[in-house]
Amino acid sequence: MHLIYFLFLVVGCSASLFDFIQNQFGGGGQAQKSPEHYEAQVLNSNCDKYLCPGTSLCVDAPKFCPCPYPSSQLRCFLPDGRYLCISKPAGDVAANYDDPRTNWKVDAKDDNIRDCGWVSRAWKGVV
């Protein structure tokens, strides 16, 4: 009788362990969406202005599109009116980039710190 209880215990623990491992390594997450799903989402949106390609948000103009990961990215404007998103600098200067209304204006004036000032200098070929 003890053998049966022991087997139930081992089987139960094994099932729990394998379920845990499957969830940790991607087995329990959502399936990736196909390009067709993304295309259908874009084509079926009710946006009558501009639909941001990275976030599917409806905004007045492309310059108002946010970065896909605003808590960890800066939106840097290029001289031709476009923008690109880069990772926020880390380390001692990271606090300078916390406010999304002003973080794109900060220029550390240091080519070792990749911020919007660095992007501007790189655009001009100075870096």
Swiss-Prot record:
Record has Signal as a keyword: yes
Signal peptide segment: 1-15
Keyword set includes Signal: yes
Alphabetically ordered keywords of this record: Signal
GO biological process: ERAD pathway
PANTHER family in the cross-refs: LONG CHRONOLOGICAL LIFESPAN PROTEIN 2 (PTHR38425:SF1)
Role, per record: Probable component of the endoplasmic reticulum-associated degradation (ERAD) pathway.
Family note: Belongs to the LCL2 family.
Protein name per UniProt: Long chronological lifespan protein 2
The organism of origin for this protein: Meyerozyma guilliermondii (strain ATCC 6260 / CBS 566 / DSM 6381 / JCM 1539 / NBRC 10279 / NRRL Y-324)
Gene this chain is encoded by: LCL2
